[in-house]
Amino acid sequence: MTMLQVHGAQIPCKGILFDIDGTLLEFLQLWGPWAETLLNQLQTRMNELGASFTVELEHVLGTIHNEQGHIVGYDPQGPLAIATVDECTGLLAGQLYAAGMPWNEAITTIRQFSSVAMREVRQRKLAEPMSGLLDFLQKCRAADIPLAVVTSDSTAAAETHLDWMGIRSFFTSIVGCDRVIKGKPDGEAAFLACRELHIHPGEAVVIGDSNGDMQMGRHAGVSYTLGYCPQLDQGSHLVDAHAIIRHYNEINVSV
């Protein structure tokens, strides 16, 4: 059986389920501008309503801002990192509702803001693969390990971002939030991905940058949950990971 070698551990592996944002691609490069555009539009509308956020700006989506107001980081346990687009929409609409806007108008307004922000994302196409990822994907292909993406984003968006990076062909299954009833941290998406890879969940490994990924894997009964965190001073949030890597070159594949 094919084995993954991580920090001395030998892990039997018949398939790998990857998160995408922050795991396959540079999260902030793609989603930072989206969140910044969205929050700026929301701030302007709140000002027009004579209202302010119910929490500090940083806590609305879980973002970190510099003195100029630009997003320079994010909370790996926050909504921006983990929530689905629909969940973020509801969260932001709640701010407008609290400011006095009817709920239906608040939802419509946030969807319009999100469309503007997504248009900018599509124009920029700032999706870059994580360092060492391509080499690891090629090793998996050489070892005939089937791969899947399991994401809180939509399936179509995930496929688009994989295309931008030129790595779509590596993945047999793409499971977005629109293909399941319960998203992460529930195990439903992992079960579906494993069925499409024709493997048992107990033969799969999950790789992700949020603890929601790790919990999804454990709920599905996968053999190993591998946390990915390039920042050397971070990673404490990955409490349900069996192990944490900082770079893809820390994983060896043997047949």
Please annotate each region the language model reported.
Residues 11-131:
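N-terminal helical cap/lid subdomain that shapes the substrate entry/recognition surface
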Residues 84, 128, 150, 181-182, ...:
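Residues that cap or flank secondary-structure elements
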Residues 1-16, 44-45, 134-142, 155-255:
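Asp-based, Mg2+/Mn2+-dependent phosphohydrolase catalytic module
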Residues 123-124, 137, 145:
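Compact structured core domains
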Residues 23, 151-153:
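Conserved phosphate-coupling serine/threonine residues in phosphotransfer and NTP-handling enzymes
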Residues 101, 140, 145:
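Short phosphate-binding/catalytic loops that engage adenosine nucleotides
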Residues 17-20, 144-148:
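Short glycine-rich or small-residue beta-strand-to-loop segments that form or flank ligand, phosphate
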